[in-house]
Amino acid sequence: LPIMLFLGAKHKEQIESMQKEKLAQNGITIVATDEDEKSPFALLPAINFLRAGGIVSMTGDRLWGEQTYVTVNFLGYEARLPDTPHLFALMTGAPLLTFFVFSDAEGIYHIRVSPGRKVCAATRAERKKAVLESVQIYADDLIRFARQHPFEWHHFEPFLGKKINAVGEKFTK
């Protein structure tokens, strides 16, 4: 199964020095994105890749440069999460899969993959809501994972925003 892996340019350099050729031999295409990249055309190869039946892997919890985002409820705080993976799923009809990697006490790594889900909108007017709902589902999955494996999720940049006022208040932004 062909895989396209989106990485920040600095991470690509690390991968290149170690494994780029081996990854390519195994059907993994590496796409390096620069933090200053603003052109939507940079994403076209991923759309075509998904439509051809491939898998595109990109981070769901880190904003890269000027990347677009939606604000969701994360443990009672605002959190800005990328909307790009969810837009890709909406535009292509490809299922969205969330995966988490963690190690156990013996140092063995495990991968947990969510059931695939579709991001659908019957009309153009419903797209924003569908993407927001999908990103909130991802945030809720991330919360569950972090609670189960509190030392396995790391975020090295400011992540939580303002506290959301009312407990149980539905957050819609």
Regions inferred by a protein language model and the residue ranges of each:
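Catalytic core of membrane glycerolipid acyltransferases/transacylases, capturing the structured
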Residues: 1-36, 52, 63-73
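Non-catalytic C-terminal accessory region of glycerolipid acyltransferases
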Residues: 25-26, 39-173
